[in-house]
């Protein structure tokens, strides 16, 4: 440890006490975005970090380079030296490392519990909602960084301007994505909460009851202290319905006339969104946002609302908006390539819920109106495909050409009628487009070689391993001869 690092740690310890009797922290599923972010912050705070995952990836390699001990595969001996074990949502009690920790009476905590511990002595800003969490977290982080406040942040995806999804800052500010998928965000006790929207998703967690999901968001907001602030999107009909039940200070944002922070005159020019933000008791801001789509204008308005309440200068806000590079796999431009059939633009996007796919399609249409939209879609989870089947069909038939990959199961068993072939048949029967089903991604290059044309926008869409597929296509530069050879 360098002298500078020791001095930095001493400064942090003056603000944030260390966890007593905790020396070594073990993460099961350390390669995931949410887990790795917390692990990286704790590693930089001086704790010994170990972790395990089923396979190596860029995240595990980066953590290993920073000094973490990463095991590939799960086995009981991995937790032998741990003071505490942190588990991701995907890890159950049958995991051999969890069983070994229980037998050795080593505390086992969920990811959100450890995040709550990081937040306990800091000024926490938590970003929740069904969609837009990762981008909003990144935008808040960028504003505070531009203002010289050096925040700690833990995000669910890569903050491209920082080159990482988490970083330990020198101030008391912690900006974090809050995960509602398993209701674990109820562990958090922030000073400021953003809620971007509320839709029916992860319903198995909530017993299939949307009212339970809504009440859980209310409970999350009521974790705020009485002087805390709830920043919520009034355009969302569910949030508008819930506002009277929120017993904390509420600040609203959106395109709606009655929003406290209001977006006006939105238009899109290619990759950039341009609009005016009107704020109460402050000058209006003319924003150039370096990521496309009305949905991202909403994400930006949420970040601007938080920054305005914290009295951050307009110069920092404007610089963050124009300077943002976005987040990994959120309408990520991977390049423009000469395919042999013509020039094609390749974009990768993580959206996997019908609402997310819909706003991505609209962003593509608005920014590149002259391009044919070719989508490679990989459904994520059979349960989501079943629950939102008609919504998926309605959204996906909007593209010009649809290539459908098999469902990315994410550990689920197949559900009859909720598979990609069925979804293709349903869309085909409506008569707008004729989807192409590709059972094996190895066949994808040849399929694309036969359908891509000059000027196409090729959009890889989904939350499974399609991001890896998109990068493989980019590595081949979408060249027809290269892809056929592959």
UniProtKB/Swiss-Prot annotation:
<keyword id="KW-0961">Cell wall biogenesis/degradation</keyword>
<keyword id="KW-0573">Peptidoglycan synthesis</keyword>
<dbReference type="GO" id="GO:0008763">
    <property type="term" value="F:UDP-N-acetylmuramate-L-alanine ligase activity"/>
</dbReference>
<dbReference type="InterPro" id="IPR004101">
    <property type="entry name" value="Mur_ligase_C"/>
</dbReference>
<keyword id="KW-0547">Nucleotide-binding</keyword>
<dbReference type="Pfam" id="PF08245">
    <property type="entry name" value="Mur_ligase_M"/>
</dbReference>
<dbReference type="GO" id="GO:0051301">
    <property type="term" value="P:cell division"/>
</dbReference>
<comment type="pathway">
    <text>Cell wall biogenesis; peptidoglycan biosynthesis.</text>
</comment>
<protein>
    <recommendedName>
        <fullName>UDP-N-acetylmuramate--L-alanine ligase</fullName>
        <ecNumber>6.3.2.8</ecNumber>
    </recommendedName>
</protein>
<keyword id="KW-0132">Cell division</keyword>
<comment type="function">
    <text>Cell wall formation.</text>
</comment>
<comment type="similarity">
    <text>Belongs to the MurCDEF family.</text>
</comment>
<dbReference type="GO" id="GO:0005737">
    <property type="term" value="C:cytoplasm"/>
</dbReference>
<dbReference type="InterPro" id="IPR000713">
    <property type="entry name" value="Mur_ligase_N"/>
</dbReference>
<keyword id="KW-0436">Ligase</keyword>
<dbReference type="InterPro" id="IPR005758">
    <property type="entry name" value="UDP-N-AcMur_Ala_ligase_MurC"/>
</dbReference>
<dbReference type="InterPro" id="IPR050061">
    <property type="entry name" value="MurCDEF_pg_biosynth"/>
</dbReference>
<feature type="binding site">
    <location>
        <begin position="129"/>
        <end position="135"/>
    </location>
    <ligand>
        <name>ATP</name>
    </ligand>
</feature>
<keyword id="KW-0133">Cell shape</keyword>
<dbReference type="InterPro" id="IPR036615">
    <property type="entry name" value="Mur_ligase_C_dom_sf"/>
</dbReference>
<dbReference type="GO" id="GO:0071555">
    <property type="term" value="P:cell wall organization"/>
</dbReference>
<keyword id="KW-0963">Cytoplasm</keyword>
<dbReference type="Pfam" id="PF01225">
    <property type="entry name" value="Mur_ligase"/>
</dbReference>
<keyword id="KW-0131">Cell cycle</keyword>
<keyword id="KW-0067">ATP-binding</keyword>
<dbReference type="GO" id="GO:0009252">
    <property type="term" value="P:peptidoglycan biosynthetic process"/>
</dbReference>
<dbReference type="InterPro" id="IPR013221">
    <property type="entry name" value="Mur_ligase_cen"/>
</dbReference>
<dbReference type="Pfam" id="PF02875">
    <property type="entry name" value="Mur_ligase_C"/>
</dbReference>
<dbReference type="InterPro" id="IPR036565">
    <property type="entry name" value="Mur-like_cat_sf"/>
</dbReference>
<dbReference type="GO" id="GO:0008360">
    <property type="term" value="P:regulation of cell shape"/>
</dbReference>
<dbReference type="GO" id="GO:0005524">
    <property type="term" value="F:ATP binding"/>
</dbReference>
């Amino acid at each position: 440890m360098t002298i500078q690092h020791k001095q930095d740690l001493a400064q942090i310890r003056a603000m944030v006490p260390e966890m007593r009797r905790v020396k070594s922290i073990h993460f099961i599923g350390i390669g995931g975005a949410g887990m790795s972010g917390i692990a990286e912050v704790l590693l930089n705070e001086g704790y010994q970090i170990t972790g395990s995952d089923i396979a190596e990836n860029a995240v595990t390699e980066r953590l290993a380079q920073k000094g973490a001990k990463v095991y590939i595969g799960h086995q009981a001996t991995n937790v032998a030296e741990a003071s505490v074990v942190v588990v991701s949502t995907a890890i159950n009690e049958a995991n051999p490392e969890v069983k070994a920790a229980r037998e050795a009476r080593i505390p086992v905590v969920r990811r959100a519990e450890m995040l709550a511990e990081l937040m306990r002595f800091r000024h926490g800003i938590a970003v929740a909602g069904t969609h837009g969490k990762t981008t909003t977290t990144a935008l808040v982080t960028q504003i505070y960084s531009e203002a010289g406040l050096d925040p700690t942040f833990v995000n669910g995806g890569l903050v491209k301007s920082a080159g990482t999804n988490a970083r330990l800052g020198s101030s008391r500010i912690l900006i974090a994505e809050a995960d509602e998928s398993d209701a674990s965000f109820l562990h958090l006790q922030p000073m400021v909460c953003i809620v971007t929207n509320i839709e029916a998703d992860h319903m198995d967690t909530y017993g299939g009851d949307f009212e339970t999901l809504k009440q859980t968001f209310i409970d999350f907001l009521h974790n705020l202290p009485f002087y805390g602030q709830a920043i919520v999107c009034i355009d969302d009909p569910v949030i508008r319905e819930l506002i009277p039940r929120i017993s904390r200070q509420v600040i609203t944002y959106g395109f709606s006339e009655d929003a406290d922070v209001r977006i006006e005159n939105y238009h899109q020019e290619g990759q950039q969104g341009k609009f005016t933000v009107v704020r109460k008791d402050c000058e209006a801001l003319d924003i150039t946002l370096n990521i496309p789509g009305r949905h991202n204008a909403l994400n930006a308005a949420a970040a601007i609302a938080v920054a305005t309440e914290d009295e951050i200068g307009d110069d920092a806000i404007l610089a963050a908006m124009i300077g943002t590079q976005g987040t990994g796999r959120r309408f990520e431009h991977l390049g423009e390539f000469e395919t042999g059939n013509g020039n094609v633009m390749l974009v990768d996007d993580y959206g996997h819920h019908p609402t997310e796919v819909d706003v991505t399609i609209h962003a593509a249409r608005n920014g590149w109106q002259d391009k044919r939209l070719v989508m490679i879609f990989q459904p994520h989870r059979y349960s989501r495909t079943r629950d939102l089947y008609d919504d998926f069909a309605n959204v996906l038939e909007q593209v010009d050409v649809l290539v459908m990959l098999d469902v990315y199961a994410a550990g689920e068993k197949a559900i009859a009628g909720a598979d990609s072939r069925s979804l293709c048949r349903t869309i085909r029967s409506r008569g707008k487009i004729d989807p192409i089903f590709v059972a094996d991604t190895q066949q994808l290059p040849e399929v694309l070689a036969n359908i891509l044309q000059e000027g196409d926008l090729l959009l890889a869409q989904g939350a499974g391993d399609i991001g890896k597929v998109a990068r493989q296509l980019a590595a081949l530069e979408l060249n027809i001869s290269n892809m056929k050879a592959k």
